[in-house]
């Protein structure tokens, strides 16, 4: 198990570096004479027509609705594996990261709403600081190598996966609108087909892919966010075949490099380009960016630590073996790395609002995530034993 986790984290570390490069490249383009080219590229109309089906969207939305559906497929596969066989497969294992994740979502959301009280437009962004970027957080931890106890790595992995599950629920409940009955009916039929494949023990991935594509189109047209189709598909793919092989894990391993080295960097490049030319100090300290940044920097660690402490004191959970509060605290700070997940929620929260709100949300996310990453890394490095000790 330790070797598998190390392999996973080493890939996350490399992907995290590429993510950072994509963000820097996007910011440079958005604040240079190339800004027109950058915005024009993302606004390029892309149309797909098959018979009566016509999907017509700018490139940015193809990235956010299409590529990110594959990322959520990967998240769904990870969640299912951890629930059935991994770090969340028993109450004892799942209790502490579950309480930590709940606190890590509620407190940042509360801080954001505190700064945006009374404004119905900006209040829509309450879930932005509630997210944790699993790839980036694990990548930062991976930089510390084998100094990090395996139990601490598993705790962060489990917490981040539960956080992702919370984000999925939030998207389904709060960021769906103008629902289409016909599209939802088609989606329901596709889901029944996927469940039927699972129940019959079909392990070939092609039938799941065909029905999954139909489901994605139906969900895209339904008013429910299309990324949720990826999660549904993941939950329907069998974890184990009769011969002991795992179609789910095979697909998960195949998707990981695509996610780390293509999907997430492309998403970051498309969404992180914030033009700073017209922004003043007053703008940076306005309710949206300050609420998000403080939610990530302060809300995440406070929420994770507070709910974890209460759960342990009430004997509802216990600390992992060989892990103390001094090690949990910097990991809680790392949970403030919202990055791609926070930017994704921002794109949903302010989709119909003035583009300025989206820029402010992305800026708050970048500032908060960057500070959380620095604090978490140096804090954890300080409390862990030195190499060779």
From Swiss-Prot:
Cell location: Cell inner membrane
Pfam families to which the protein is assigned, alphabetical: Na_H_antiport_1
A single GO BP: regulation of pH
Catalytic activity: Na(+)(in) + 2 H(+)(out) = Na(+)(out) + 2 H(+)(in)
Keywords associated with the record: Antiport, Cell inner membrane, Cell membrane, Ion transport, Membrane, Sodium, Sodium transport, Transmembrane, Transmembrane helix, Transport
Membrane topology classification: Multi-pass membrane protein
Gene Ontology terms: cellular component: plasma membrane
GO molecular function: sodium:proton antiporter activity
Bilayer-spanning residue ranges: 14-34, 59-79, 95-115, 124-144, 154-174, 177-197, 213-233, 261-281, 290-310, 328-348, 363-383
Family under the similarity heading: Belongs to the NhaA Na(+)/H(+) (TC 2.A.33) antiporter family.
Function of the molecule: Na(+)/H(+) antiporter that extrudes sodium in exchange for external protons.
HAMAP family reported for this sequence: NhaA
Name used for this protein in its record: Na(+)/H(+) antiporter NhaA
Gene: nhaA
